Amino acid sequence: GVASITFRGNQLISGVAINFLASGLTVLIGQRWFELGGRTPQLVEGGRFAPIQLPFAEALAPVPIIGPIWSELISGHTILVYVALALVPVTWWVLYRTRFGLRLRAVGENPAAVDTAGVSVSGMRYAAVAICGVLCGLAGAYLATGLAAGFVKEMSAGRGYIALAALIIAKWRPWQALGTTLLFGLLEAL
């Protein structure tokens, strides 16, 4: 955020540089703290987020079509998956139904107009970076505790770039981004 907001650096170059820095720094910190070659110790079963079985998942399992969809596709994920899905309508509501969302979208589209209205462009951009950091932290927590049992070098395997591609394809809209990411997830699962 500082590189592109305060120092007005190119966002693409800053983003790639931060990714390279984070990739090396996480391994270095992991090596110093745990001395396991840049990995973390495996989490014990109680340290991971357990899958949640939704109501009627077992009862509906034998029902054709609906059963497999409910019991295998929708049920059995960790709490972080359901939180992420619940955040899609919340994100849409904040972006399209609140003053903060209007200002946030305006900062991206026309920062001069926002500045003329007396709103701090830098402040709004830093708020966006902070919110993005929280959401990316949720994604990282899922990778480290839900998908795997600890940190391993390059464990994201480019998923951040895939998420960025999904966002661009969805034209920065939350509901379309959900559909695009579900499509990408389906294609990855095949």
Locations of regions flagged by a protein language model:
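Transmembrane helix-loop junctions in multipass membrane proteins, especially transporters and channels
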Residues: 5, 9, 32-39, 96, ...
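Helix-loop interface residues and adjacent transmembrane-helix termini in multi-pass membrane transporters
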Residues: 6-8, 123, 171
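Transmembrane alpha-helical segments in multi-pass inner-membrane proteins
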Residues: 136, 146-190
